[in-house]
UniProtKB/Swiss-Prot annotation:
Involved in cell wall synthesis where it is required for glycosylation. Involved in cell cycle progression through cell-size checkpoint. This is Mannose-1-phosphate guanyltransferase. Belongs to the transferase hexapeptide repeat family. It catalyses: alpha-D-mannose 1-phosphate + GTP + H(+) = GDP-alpha-D-mannose + diphosphate. One of its GO terms (molecular function) is GTP binding. The lineage of its organism: Eukaryota, Fungi, Dikarya, Ascomycota, Saccharomycotina. Its EC number is 2.7.7.13. Pfam families: GMPPB_C, NTP_transferase. InterPro entries: GMPPB_C, GMPPB_N, Mannose-1P_guanyltransferase, NTP_transferase_dom, Nucleotide-diphossugar_trans. GO terms for cellular component: cytoplasm. SUPFAM superfamilies: Nucleotide-diphospho-sugar transferases (SSF53448). Disulfide bonds: none annotated. It is found in: Cytoplasm.
Length: 362
């Protein structure tokens, strides 16, 4: 089988982190985001993976090529000269994706979940449709495009309703699909939306089905959702692979993932819902909640870090406090006793006075 990961462009929603690394290489759960997907695809028997990119492919090539041998897959970069939307990349990579008649997994690189690729492939084969969308249930369907099913045929999609005013269902497109190679014949070589231009054709021909996703799901393409997705990921890890989580005495509230190379003072309080990356240093009496500390960062004595993504090589000073979905880019310094609330701080900046309201610090 084959897989296409829609990597896309600049990752502006996740700035300032993506000013340093392309979004797929930003660590989620201490591993590059895209590695979670490559591993899951390989586990389901995928042998050819295409990464559809239009921004800084050269940075990703060297990093991702080493995973080919590790996971027994061939990774091809399909570089768009202009953004081709969500369907155009399938046409651009047609040579690889249509080399045999096995189905193609398609997924957005921002999506984190329990990737049900094997179950999806089995369902797709049984349904007899040309394509299957993975659907996830949401609490507020009025914010999304909702899937409405055929009354007579289970899982057959009848139509999509964009941001419905009245309740018509609570299942939405989760950004994962499986397609027969023949679907590529419906796509033109131009910027095209698979959701708005390709799927309606399949719906009209009664060839599009949905598969219900069990477990967690999150689009982690922006900081608020990156942190929420981290909570969901750690919760899933606590149920499936609890030994991966830290259980040292400094853990407070559980669900903490710590790289073995991190140095944490025994008097610190860490948790719940924290990821601490390689070579991170946490000082005496520091308090960290619902945050991600990327590699080589430091939280000094008695600092309080909450709802924060601390970028690579960044430093939070003694008695400083961060909160309110704060994101520090690469090599940022928060001086001692400074309060930062909801700021996005670009790389190589030093903050020496309080930031009390949401702001972008350039």
């Amino acid at each position: 089988m084959k897989g296409l990961i829609l990597v896309g462009g600049y990752g502006t929603r996740l700035r300032p982190l993506t000013l340093t690394l392309p979004k797929p290489l930003v660590e989620f759960g201490n591993r590059p985001m895209i590695l979670h997907q490559i591993e899951a695809l390989a586990k389901a028997g995928v042998t050819d993976i295409v990464l559809a990119v239009n921004y800084r492919p050269e940075v990703m090539v060297s990093t991702l090529k080493k995973y080919e041998a590790e996971y027994g897959v061939t990774i091809t970069f399909s570089v768009e000269e202009e953004p081709l939307g969500t369907a155009g990349p399938l046409k651009l990579a047609e040579k690889v994706l249509k080399k045999d008649d096995t189905p193609i997994f398609v997924l957005n690189s921002d999506v984190i979940c329990d990737y049900p690729f094997q179950e999806l492939a089995d369902f797709h084969k049984t349904s007899g449709g040309k394509a299957t969308i993975v659907a996830t249930k949401v609490d507020e369907p009025s914010k999304y495009g909702v899937i409405v099913h055929d009354r007579d045929t289970p899982n057959l999609i009848d139509r999509f309703v964009e941001k419905p005013v009245e309740f018509v269902g609570n299942r939405i497109n989760a950004g994962l699909y499986i397609l027969n190679p023949s679907v590529i014949d419906l796509i033109e070589m131009k910027p095209t939306s698979i959701e708005k231009e390709t799927f309606p054709i399949l719906v009209e021909n009664k060839e599009l089905y949905s598969f219900d996703l069990e477990g967690y799901w999150m689009d982690v393409g922006q900081p608020k959702d990156f942190l929420s997705g981290t909570v969901l990921y750690l919760t899933a890890l606590s149920k499936k692979e609890p030994k991966k989580l830290c259980n040292e005495k400094f853990i407070h509230g559980g669900n903490v993932l710590v790289d073995p190379s991190a140095k944490i003072h025994p008097s610190a309080l860490i948790g719940p819902n924290v990821v601490i990356g390689p070579n991170v240093v946490v000082g005496e009496g520091a308090r960290i909640q619902r945050s991600v500390l990327l590699s080589n960062s430091e939280v000094k004595d008695h600092a309080w870090v909450k709802s924060t993504i601390v970028g690579w090589n960044s430093r939070i000073g003694k008695w400083a406090r961060t909160d309110g979905i704060t994101v520090l880019g690469d090599d940022v310094e928060i001086k001692n006793e400074v309060y930062v609330n909801g700021a996005k701080v670009l790389p190589h900046k030093s903050i020496s006075s309080n930031v009390e309201h949401e702001a972008i610090i350039m």
